[in-house]
């Protein structure tokens, strides 16, 4: 921040730019400022304080005055030219800051010394940056010429007087700036500077309290500057101020007290964190951060899910596009194949319009009929396969029945042979019985006994013969029943066979008819595709 001292004619600045507005009437201000130059703005309004350039010119004044007093003699000035001297000469009550003075109601409510250094500042930081630039650019010059405000405030008074009391009042006003007031504070920057100590509209409190530390490092010791007899300016007078009361006091004066307080503070924090009611601010902060982290995690998850969904949709669209292109390529290849086989129409010239084809509709109908007949043929083939499977099953059943009939016939023949043998045995026994009874006329006990035995044997033979006859009758009935069943199965198989053969003949006949019809349709299509022969008049020979 480049600053230069103003010309000699312009009124010197002072620390009064840091003062807040006092409750004085406009008439008193106009009367006090009538003789001072540069105290009004171009629009005619009174300036509230001095600019930063005038403040810096005030700080540089001792060095410039020391250079200018080499060739000229020092002469006391009867009429004060600076703003602060004129102001406090006319209004001595504003500069009375002695220990016995009490603040009047409504006048010095905002002038009390407050520990403003430790108040939080919420400004835009322009004043802090401007003071940093001031310290960096003009540090060397201010170190040689001026002193720090800390040195000004701590030195005992050397020659108390009206100017010392005025400077003391100005310094106390600078240290007691009210940061929470509703009125805007005076600016410390001119139109060319980039930052200001003033509070811009819409911003927080002024950062002047946090920037006062830089003023303590803006120059060297004011004692060195005030030792020479030719350094007789306002900074020399400021160095003679008495020590002001401290604006604040530390709660812990030593490191031992701080170490003793720390365990109690840690225990309080632990007890506060262990509370279950959630009233602890640390617990609330942790819960708020956890809630924010969960919300951020959910947001990231939703974004990831949305991204994956979009990627899947894009992949699906790409696959659909590839499928559509493949279908188009397949249709094109089919058309090319049909054109190569001679089934496609002849290509026309690119400039000619397509002519109306009267055979297009019959061709489409023929194609539709061919497709329909092909479907019918496939259905008939399926039915034929099913009928052939049923016929094979029936043939297998007939073969098994024939095998069973053959076995039953063999068994019946064996039983018939046994029955014939038994009959012959019975007949022989019957013939032998009367032949034995005729020669034995005398009846003895032996004969009687033998006769009884023969009768008993004949009765047993008769019973067995009757039993055999009954069994033979049953076998004959069973054989007849099996023969009837076999004959019925044979007739059924014959009917099925004739029906299947008739169905096959019908299918073959229908297939042949369809084949002939397809051939005829293909011939018609071929005839329709052939270009018509050009018409030529019939030439008749004139020779007879």
UniProtKB/Swiss-Prot annotation:
Its main location: cytoplasm. Residues 61-84, 116-252, 335-365, 430-465 are annotated as: Disordered. Residues 294-530 form a coiled coil. Keywords: Cell projection, Coiled coil, Cytoplasmic vesicle, Developmental protein, Immunity, Innate immunity, Neurogenesis, Phosphoprotein. Disulfide bonds: none annotated. GO terms for cellular component: axon; cytoplasmic vesicle; dendrite. Residues 186-222 have a biased composition (Low complexity). The modification Phosphoserine is found at residue 176. It comes from the Eukaryota. It is found in: Cytoplasmic vesicle; Cell projection, Axon; Cell projection, Dendrite. Belongs to the N4BP3 family. This is NEDD4-binding protein 3. It comes from Homo sapiens. The lineage of its organism: Eukaryota, Metazoa, Chordata, Craniata, Vertebrata. The gene is N4BP3.
